[in-house]
Amino acid sequence: MNFKENNIYSGFKLLNIENLNEIGGVGLRFEHEKTKAKLIKILSEDDNKCFAIGFRTPPENSTGVPHILEHSVLCGSRKFNTKEPFVELLKGSLNTFLNAMTYPDKTIYPVASRNEKDFMNLMDVYLDAVLYPNIYKHKEIFMQEGWHYYIENKEDELKYNGVVYNEMKGAYSSPDSILYRKIPQTIYPDTCYALSSGGDPDEIPNLTYEEFVEFHKKYYHPSNSYIFLYGNGDTEKELEFINEEYLKNFEYKEIDSEIKEQKSFESMKEESFTYGIAESEDLNHKSYYSLNFVIGDATDGEKGLAFDVLAYLLTRSTAAPLKKALIDAGIGKAVSGDFDNSTKQSAFTVLVKNAELNKEEEFKKVVMDTLKDLVENGIDKELIEASINRVEFELREGDYGSYPNGLIYYLKVMDSWLYDGDPYVHLEYEKNLEKIKSALTSNYFEDLIERYMINNTHSSLVSLHPEKGINEKKSAELKKKLEEIKNSFDEKTLNEIIDNCKKLKERQSTPDKKEDLESIPMLSLEDIDKEATKIPTEEKEIDGITTLHHDFHTNKIDYVNFFFNTNSVPEDLIPYVGLLCDILGKCGTENYDYSKLSNAINISTGGISFGAITFANLKKNNEFRPYLEISYKALSSKTNKAIELVDEIVNHTDLDDMDRIMQIIREKRARLEGAIFDSGHRIAMKKVLSYSTNRGAYDEKISGLDYYDFLVNIEKEDKKSTISDSLKKVRDLIFNKGNMLISYSGKEEEYENFKEKVKYLISKTNNNDFEKEEYNFELGKKNEGLLTQGNVQYVAKGGNYKTHGYKYSGALSLLESILGFDYLWNAVRVKGGAYGVFSNFRRDGGAYIVSYRDPNIKSTLEAYDNIPKYLNDFEADEREMTKYIIGTIRKYDQPISNGIKGDIAVSYYLSNFTYEDLQKEREEIINADVEKIKSFAPMIKDLMKEDYICVLGNEEKIKENKDLFNNIKSVIK
């Protein structure tokens, strides 16, 4: 329909209409007349519709009330009176996104779906959740999601428990996370940004139930809301629904949700903090330093885009001068930079990890001297061109991976809208990009550096140093504090607390009423496609090399992958495959030093990457295919240069430049150490798979904890000639025509252009024939306890079901949904307090269950062991099974970006997995019934009896359970 400014549509006044050419949409900005709720609809042809409602929620302390509320409002509401409507939606919706997020100054609730009926259902449940939550009726919601005193018997130890409490204990375990929480405290000390909206575990137990509900009353009102709609949905219908069902029932309310601005400093602040490490760890090379500059108004689109480019130019590019200067000076092992435009005043951070103790002044001097040198002598124009091109490529490509476009646009809109700026300023980039391109012939970036960094007193230098025993001390203090609290309770109070825990358990264990479950809107099986999505793949040949062509529209961008089978690499050299991938593209070559190579890559492509990857041969048990994958994306017009660069890197990288190679090894080691804290569940599950499958054992050597140990050892041993010789040998074994496969995504016309150009690379590739290795890894029950200074655990258990004679069925994917959203969710998250838990049954036989930020070990493993009993007793009516089936099919039908489509198709090809197999899998999901789910009980029982476990987490907790492990060792070296 034709919308007109100043007209009223279902209670919403249309304030303005704006063409958003960069994203191919039209922005309609409304205000609700009665409540003054703000609403934006971006009209688009995109069928992946998005809805979000957000609120300004500046915290007044660090008890985490915004975060706890974000969890809690999704635990039942006026119309949807189940314990967790959110989980019911996860079970049975076709959503393409469903989540909620707490930021330092806002809380948002976004959903997305391609199905219109589903989209309206999601919008209904979310609006009811935020405006009419059951938190006022059930204090147990606050106890479960936030915190409570946990004690079952009078003689037991008193503990704290709660989902957010445990989540934040995990978040505060990582030095990276600690640093990123300290930085805002130093540059915004007088604002809400100095506080933890997520919650400081030391402060969370200070939050009362009364303060919790008061926060909702104050901020969760339409007058303080920012509502967003995106896609090809019926706008009038959407506005009418929001008004009639919700907003018309509210009056305008004056709400003070002002986000205060920090006054500038007269001089740079310098602050130092500590984090805990184990007694066995070395204090050296464990410090973190950051320089932080407040840039200014987040609603300035040009400045925001310019600093996105500058962050890449100074710290992220392989040619980045700040990174190079700091690494060359030996200050630290990994350098990164970040421009944060999601707060009222944006900030730019330069950060170094794994640095020596007490080097903060040297760090500051190197950064400031480098910046001054760039201003005085000018930034290399080629580096400027490369950095602008990289950022521009990403903007124009608009590939946000698995995230819906609408969600990304909402986040960009909120970066200005929340602060009363032009909501579209970060979407409309063309004008700003043209201004920034003037940097190629002016001092544009030099002036920014001088003004906002060199001469900026609103800045801070933050140091984070390791300290032994700090975590043990805090743990002992908490234990003592809880003992004192327990001793201060009279008998009546203690009985009340025990009684409250019982009531909470009863509520958690009581099934929802049938009528309440049926209040949650859901789709029927008629709403899902019976046919699996087919990605076009045609097997062709270019000069004798098998080439897979995926013919679909890519906006004249080539998405190219070269695969080289690595099964001629001997077992003892397997880790060097991972190392070779980390080095290629970051080292100098015959014709480029590494900085010039980085610039050439960014000028001509959207990136060239290298990775070690494995594929299971699904037609043969425990057989897999290891590959080295080279990927690039580039405009079709730049195909020739992209292929020349791939040849330059593959065939002419200088593997004798050991100074550069050692820098890369140290940086990779530092980044892996960060991942240990942030992705502990991945490490634990990889370990478990390595005990029971050859593929898992190989993956562990190229990307798991074994690979980390390998990097530590070669760095310590400093055997430079051995490293260089091994890399050369592995390179020669891998890059051969006999190992090669090509995958190309793009239309036929572009393919023909690529076909002619790629012949050059094929002609430069060796044609040697090497013997293939037969890998027979030592599998078995290694059961490792991996010690960290974290405060929570990641508990994994698994095995290989095919070794017990079981076969894969699509219904196993359904089982993952049932366990994840019913049994495991209730046993490990709701009752146990873990932040997350999920299972995975791979097509190759590998299987695992893993928890995330879990306060427990034994009770979690007991929950895993009780799965067969749950399955034997499993009951579900037709409605419940339909819900699970729809939710499982959703995982198969997510929108796929152009960059990922070809990856999926080639993974099927290399796994011997056909479209017919995919269709069969889909039918097995759709046709599964209760009996089929029950039939998996023996399989899970056999898996659990194998008793393959790995736990990564708190040292004290693991040592308390030492009988579970065959080997206990510290992770960080």
Curated annotation (Swiss-Prot):
PANTHER family: PRESEQUENCE PROTEASE (PTHR43016), PRESEQUENCE PROTEASE, MITOCHONDRIAL (PTHR43016:SF13)
Full protein name: Protein HypA
A Pfam family it matches: M16C_assoc
Domain of life: Bacteria
SUPFAM superfamilies: LuxS/MPP-like metallohydrolase (SSF63411)
GO MF assignments: metal ion binding; metalloendopeptidase activity
UniProt-listed GO biological process terms: protein processing
